[in-house]
Amino acid sequence: MSGFGDVPDQYDPAGVEERVFSYWEAVDAYEQTVDHRADAETFFFVDGPPYTSGAAHMGTTWNKTLKDAYIRYHRMQGYDVTDRPGYDMHGLPIETKVEEQLGFESKKDIQEFGEEAFIEECKRFADDNLDGLQSDFQSFGVWMDWDNPYKTVDPSYMEAAWWAFSEVHDNGLVERGQRSISQCPRCETAIANNEVEYEDVTDPSIYVRFDLDDREGSLVVWTTTPWTIPANQFVAVDEDGDYQQVRATTPDGETDVLYVASECVEDVLSAGGYSDHEIVADHSGSDLIGWSYTPPLADAVPANPTDADGTHEVYHGDWVEADRTGLVHSAPGHGEEDFERGAELDLPVFCPVGEDGVYTDAGGKYAGAFVRDANDDIIADLEARDAMLASQTVEHSYGHCWRCDTGIIQIVTDQWFITITDVKDELLANMDTSEWHPEWARDNRFRDFVENAPDWNVSRQRYWGIPVPIWTPEDWSGDAEDVLVVGTREELAALADQDVDPASVDLHKPTVDDITITEDGTEYTRVPDVFDVWLDSSVASWGTLNYPEQEDDFDELWPADLIMEAHDQTRGWFWSQLGMGTAALGDVPYEEVLMHGYANMPDGRGMSKSKGITIEPNEVIDEYGADPMRMFLLSVTPQGDDMSFSWDETENMQRDLNILWNVFRFPRPYMALDDFDANVPAAFGGDDAGVGIADADLETVDEWLLSRLQHVKADATAHWEDFEQHRALDAVLEFVVEDLSRYYVQVVRERMWEDDASASKTAAYATMQRVLLEVVALLAPYAPFVTEELYSHLTGDRGYDTVHMADWPTVEESLRAPALEADVAVLRAAEEAGSHARQQAGRKLRWPVTRVVVDAAEDSVVDALDAHGDLLADRLNTRAIEVVEPGAAWDELAYSARADMSELGPAFGDDAGAVMNALNDARVTDRDIDALAEQVAADLGRDDIELTTEMVEFVEETPEHVAGAAFETETAAGTVYVDTELNEDVESEGYAREVVRRVQEMRKEMDLAMDAEIRLDVLVFDERVGELVARHEPLITAETRARELGEVEDGHREEWDVEGTTMILEVEAV
């Protein structure tokens, strides 16, 4: 790929990608680009690691495309960018996929298969998917350090997590304790609250009576989890709430005394099917506090500590609202709020449910049953004990495991925690030092999450993860200060009773499980848990730098300059990094955050592979190419909003790249014919030899295009710096399509067609070379394939080997001409209006017109035409332009009036018809209602005619053969009138240009070289038209490269209908 080599006629994305991939490999393009900035100012980008649990979907494709684009942009801005890709290779996302492959349904299957064998399967699965993911990312042009990714399974990375956790422990923020946690009974492990995914399900909805001990009646509670009632310890009320004692009567005359929140009485009685009731007494919630009751299933679950002090009484609960019954069944062994309030009250924690969701022996009658399966038995037992007031069902949102989709349960277990709540103020202060795009994501969504974040449960009862590096002594008391937390492999080797090689030790289970440590005669063994997988990625900002094993890069680069992920990471990676950075290092590990949205289907539905609702990236690449797909993804705002994929917009991107391709191809053959010595500036690795814009005698339109380019460069750079690359793309594409393709190329086409080299052609060549080079650079982060190919043709052997080594284009103030830009904006608006007027008149642009009249509404129109009227005349193919100054009237215009009889009738009564007829005949030279009234009065012989603007609508009447159209810009307005009256001179040139167009088509059909000369015979079957054509023989021969018009012996012959006249044209190559 060099110089003026062959350029395919059409933009073919697949062909371009194939050639560019080969080229990149041949010249080590990525490696050269990295080395080129090796000594520059650093920019530390940290890649949020995707799970290696499947192929790249549209969401990860959008994410990686954004990252790649911003990395390329920063490199072009002169930075040495850290671009190490990362992969999250531990945790449930991997384990559940492996379980599916092996047909496992529970932990028991894993135990039977063998823990070590299962871990090896997980490792193999993660490695295989890493290769697939990496291949996916490379397929759409992502450049990262693919040979050196950070992997959460590597010993150096796992050590980074161990070290951070040991720092957290040294800071006094590690605790072993009981908490109510979300538990997946299938995976048999705790999961973080932010990992819980909610689905609508149908569950029991029961109202239960808890009989009071020392007074008549029952407390009425409501729950959707009957399976938690065996663990009930207290009932919570709102101490400030209003409650009522109600005597309710059933249809058969029996009565029940119930205690319910005042606002809930009617609903509770309706649910219970009561026919009548009376309010016995009003109570405040504080009145009820201290009342004791008998749990309805006490005999079925004898292990429930009914005799413990304070159990089975009424207490205040901050979370209680006047909803359902206004009294809340509370089981500290299950619910999070229940557990916290129970701890405050020093109540026992009774949890008769195991990690698998099955009742333990403490569950009494229900022992061995899965909790949700036990609901029916519990409901039946409540009914048998006359404790059931009403049993219904409800559809509601319920939490499920994020990986296996099993409904979660809340149970209390012993876990390891980082006590984030102890450093909440530091978390919020550190958060405020980071800059977010959009800002509201930090100040609203993220702040809310951080403010309400509980202590971080970092332990998981699984296999494939980073083992928790805690060794506990024999007969451990549970005090976190008495444990050993190992921070590095070297430390492990020094402390271990066994021989451990720090360079080769595998830190995974079960290797580390067998390692013991003895200190002062006491043996320590490792706890069996692995880390929450979010802790893995929380250390990415130093793990990617191989810290603490290597310190230099950390000291130079940390914290990260930029991270970017989707908005779900406010509860995920953004949060875990802030939490770990603050707890371990006292600082936030990133300075700037770009938060984008989700990738959705075209109709706005969320994509889901499991539901078959998805658009795969390879589908899009096969249909339209990688560059168009990237450009669409980068045309969407990256700041918080979700993206709905659009096939149409992706097709439009391919169309725009095809326009760029054609613009690029346009001057190449002319440049080659003239041996144009193209200039390559130093910013592109060139030596500034050849003909540049500084050496050329630029014409007005060249200066205009270069000025517009400066405007676009300034806007694009500002948008990139504001993380609005979509707006930068809009600006560049508008320039390519509107300014470059639809205007400049059309204006300079005839300059390119001139036979001999000239200063005018040279200026156009130099302008196109510079503009195309900089446009290619501006588009390089978006479309790395096509820009690479175009760049190589533009630079040949003079520039860098890859466009991605080039500097980002900077604004050249000397080329700015804002006044010229404003003038040309007026001319283009007038040209568009003139084209519309031509269409109205049915006159093609290739036919000249005798004159164009511009009725200017502002002086800026007059100024633009005075300075550059010849440019508009050329574009509208007119022999002359006449200008009507602002405030003046074109004396060839007239205005008639269209009457509104609904206004004339009431005003003129019986004379309205006569007035209307007079209005139809009246003509004035301006939209002057008084002048119109004078004409009507004179026509009717009256002097009492008064008209208003509501009575008539002025209608402009142009002279015969004249059509007009208005235009308006931000600073100018006017009307363009085109006089399409024919005379022989106009006809002669019009027919001649019709001949030229058809000969050019024939040349193309014959595949003639652009500079090939021909013989041309023109036979016209109309004597008059033939004479008109003959008058412009020099124009025809010049435009078609015909030596002469004359008889052709053996040429390509075609018959044409030209404006109703038959012509036979015959072309023969010389």
Swiss-Prot record:
ATP binds at K609. Its cofactor is Zn(2+). InterPro entries: aa-tRNA-synth_Ia, Anticodon_Ile_ABEc, Ile-tRNA-ligase, Ile-tRNA-ligase_type2, M/V/L/I-tRNA-synth_anticd-bd, Rossmann-like_a/b/a_fold, tRNAsynth_Ia_anticodon-bd, Val/Leu/Ile-tRNA-synth_edit. GO terms for molecular function: aminoacyl-tRNA deacylase activity; ATP binding; isoleucine-tRNA ligase activity; tRNA binding; zinc ion binding. It catalyses: tRNA(Ile) + L-isoleucine + ATP = L-isoleucyl-tRNA(Ile) + AMP + diphosphate. It is found in: Cytoplasm. Its EC number is 6.1.1.5. A motif ('HIGH' region) lies at residues 50-60. GO terms for cellular component: cytosol. Keywords: Aminoacyl-tRNA synthetase, ATP-binding, Cytoplasm, Ligase, Metal-binding, Nucleotide-binding, Protein biosynthesis, Zinc. The keyword Aminoacyl-tRNA synthetase applies. One of its GO terms (biological process) is isoleucyl-tRNA aminoacylation. A motif ('KMSKS' region) lies at residues 606-610. PANTHER family: ISOLEUCINE--TRNA LIGASE, CYTOPLASMIC, SOLEUCYL-TRNA SYNTHETASE. IleRS has two distinct active sites: one for aminoacylation and one for editing. The misactivated valine is translocated from the active site to the editing site, which sterically excludes the correctly activated isoleucine. The single editing site contains two valyl binding pockets, one specific for each substrate (Val-AMP or Val-tRNA(Ile)). Belongs to the class-I aminoacyl-tRNA synthetase family. IleS type 2 subfamily. Catalyzes the attachment of isoleucine to tRNA(Ile). As IleRS can inadvertently accommodate and process structurally similar amino acids such as valine, to avoid such errors it has two additional distinct tRNA(Ile)-dependent editing activities. One activity is designated as 'pretransfer' editing and involves the hydrolysis of activated Val-AMP. The other activity is designated 'posttransfer' editing and involves deacylation of mischarged Val-tRNA(Ile). Monomer. This is Isoleucine--tRNA ligase.
